[in-house]
């Protein structure tokens, strides 16, 4: 609630829309309506109920906002099995990057939030901002995020408990790690990063939350250009706490989107087989590959006869014939994706790896 009050006080002249749990839709923003909703939300929290709230520069949910403060909370006592992590997101205009004062203001928000909350993980940086109802815009987010690796796809971040309850999603301009995650990184790794890449800074709050920043301005991570080494080095260093096989990032099944396979590729987009301990081998010629993966579906057929095993949940390896449907096997209830099968043995003796592609 304090975050919402602070955001409203600083940016009220930009705010036009408001959505709290009792509204079920966006309504016109006013200071009076905001105070009324905040009072009701306080009572909601006291009843040990989750809270969803948004204040936005957009009056309606049809457009992407320049300013937005959004949360979906857990219950205060954490009694609900599927709602044990709270989500908080703040949006600011991209034009802030051009203004040194605004960039400092942005960093003040990062420091404030990390000092106020026992953060598990998070990030601050570039994002493809979508309207409140993002499903139809997922193909757009996919196109942007697969071309610019440092622009975060975030339309389903509110559901992070499904995927990221024990690991981080990715690195970013600012990468935020709670104490439980940052302690899993060996001290010598932090020391090596500081020596090799002085533009990577680490600031740790009194509560143990660490903020790792790369450069004064974010690199977009253009996939058509050589990727910045400092991002690749940080990715390598934090790989032990980044989710290796996450859920799918998108809901869609038809248009280009982040299905389970493409989500795996995205998670490993910064990986470089020619980098070791933050140092790129200039003579390295190893081609980046990924395992052969197939997400199950009604029309999906086995592409190669051989031994396949579930990759995104526990399951037994089975032999499957080429052209046959994949079997239906039990999977976790909170897994948005279908079973992601990995080929671990081929009848024809062929390769078990592919060069990852977002096309």
Which stretches of residues belong to each language-model region?
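Short, surface-exposed beta-strand/loop "edge" segments at domain boundaries and coil↔beta transitions
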Residues: 96-99, 217-228, 315-319, 350-351
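Amphipathic, interaction-prone secondary-structure segments
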Residues: 38-64, 180-185, 189-204, 306-309
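Short, flexible domain-boundary/linker segments around small modular repeats
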Residues: 70-74, 285-295
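C-terminal interaction module
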Residues: 1-14, 132-289
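Compact beta-sheet-dominated domain cores in extracellular/mature segments
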Residues: 289-359
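Short, exposed beta-strand/loop patches in secreted or surface proteins that constitute
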Residues: 71-72, 78, 199-204, 318
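Short, flexible N-terminal segments of the mature chain
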Residues: 2-21, 318-333
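Internal, hydrophobic cores of structured domains that mediate oligomerization or house catalytic pockets
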Residues: 11-144
């Amino acid at each position: 609630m304090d975050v919402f009050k602070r955001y409203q006080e600083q940016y009220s002249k930009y705010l036009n829309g408001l959505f709290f749990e009792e509204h079920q839709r966006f309504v016109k923003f006013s200071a009076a309506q905001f105070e009324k909703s905040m009072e009701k939300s306080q009572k909601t929290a006291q009843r040990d109920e989750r809270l969803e709230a948004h204040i936005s520069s957009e009056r309606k949910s049809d457009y992407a906002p320049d300013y937005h403060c959004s949360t979906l909370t857990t219950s205060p006592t954490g009694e609900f099995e599927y709602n044990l992590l709270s989500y908080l997101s703040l949006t600011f205009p991209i034009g802030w990057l051009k203004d040194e004062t605004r960039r400092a203001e942005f960093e003040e928000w990062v420091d404030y939030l990390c000092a106020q909350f026992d953060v598990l993980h998070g990030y601050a940086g570039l994002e493809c901002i979508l309207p409140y109802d993002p499903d139809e815009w997922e193909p757009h987010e996919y196109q942007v995020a697969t071309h610019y690796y440092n622009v975060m796809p975030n339309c389903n971040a509110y559901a992070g408990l499904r995927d990221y309850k024990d690991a981080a999603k990715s690195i970013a301009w600012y990468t935020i790690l709670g104490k439980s995650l940052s302690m899993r990184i060996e001290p010598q790794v932090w020391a090596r990063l500081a020596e090799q890449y002085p533009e990577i800074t680490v600031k740790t709050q009194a509560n143990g939350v660490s903020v790792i920043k790369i450069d004064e301005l974010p690199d977009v991570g253009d996939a058509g250009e050589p990727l910045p080494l400092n991002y690749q080095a940080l990715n390598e260093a934090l790989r032990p706490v980044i989710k290796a096989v996450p859920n799918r990032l998108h809901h869609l099944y038809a248009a280009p989107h982040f299905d389970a396979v493409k989500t795996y590729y995205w998670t490993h987009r910064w990986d470089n087989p020619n980098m070791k301990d933050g140092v790129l081998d200039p003579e390295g010629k190893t081609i980046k590959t990924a395992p052969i993966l197939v997400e199950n579906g009604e029309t999906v057929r086995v592409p190669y006869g051989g031994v396949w095993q579930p990759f995104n949940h526990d399951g037994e390896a089975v032999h499957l014939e080429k052209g046959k449907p994949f079997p239906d096997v039990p999977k976790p209830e909170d897994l948005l994706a279908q079973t992601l099968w990995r080929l671990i043995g081929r009848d024809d003796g062929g390769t078990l790896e592919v060069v990852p592609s977002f096309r």
